[in-house]
Amino acid sequence: PIDGIEWDDDMLHRDGSNDVTIGTITSQWGTAATRWNSLYKAVARATKVIQALDNGTADGINEEKTNQYKGEAYFMLGFAYGELATYYGDCVLNKGMTLEEAYEAVRTPKKEVMAYAYECLDKAIELLPDSHTGQQRPTKGVALGIKARFALYHEDWETAAQAAEQCMNSKVYKLHDNYGELFKADSSPELMFYFKGDLT
């Protein structure tokens, strides 16, 4: 999942040597450390939301909204662990350990982490609605698409094909009719999950 020039083998800094070009990247290097920390913050927050909703502390929230919020939290949990396994391989799998247990935690094999990511995404698929008015919140199709993407990254072809087929069969998403107009429109059936930016 290349998502920045610092992961590209064609990267060039004109101002001299750096950690990328001289091969001295460590676990404390900017992007590596930031991504690791951010993903574990997402895990902690999503877990807290799920625990709160399971404990019935969501007074005043109806069942439909409870399912939506829980589905979004499971989506975030599955997404975070999928990213962790993709970028780092074996990593700590926290299913609600105490702080004391966390100090003694060891890395879980990548295969087990991905199995848990799939499990969380499957729960999200069950709970999330088919669509929202905007693309800023995950839906069933988005969770299926993310599951398919992670499965592709990890060469899990059968899971990737099944998730992609389910997403396509939902008929919610399709390619934009006119590619040249895609970037002018506020929305498109091709866009699954995005945050709108301001070009000015």
Where are these regions (language model features)?
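Alpha-helical junction/boundary sensor with strong preference for TPR arrays
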Residues: 53, 121, 128, 170-171
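Short acidic-aromatic linear motifs embedded in glycine-rich loops, typified by GG[WY][YF]DAGD(H)
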Residues: 1-74, 82, 86-87, 91-112, ...
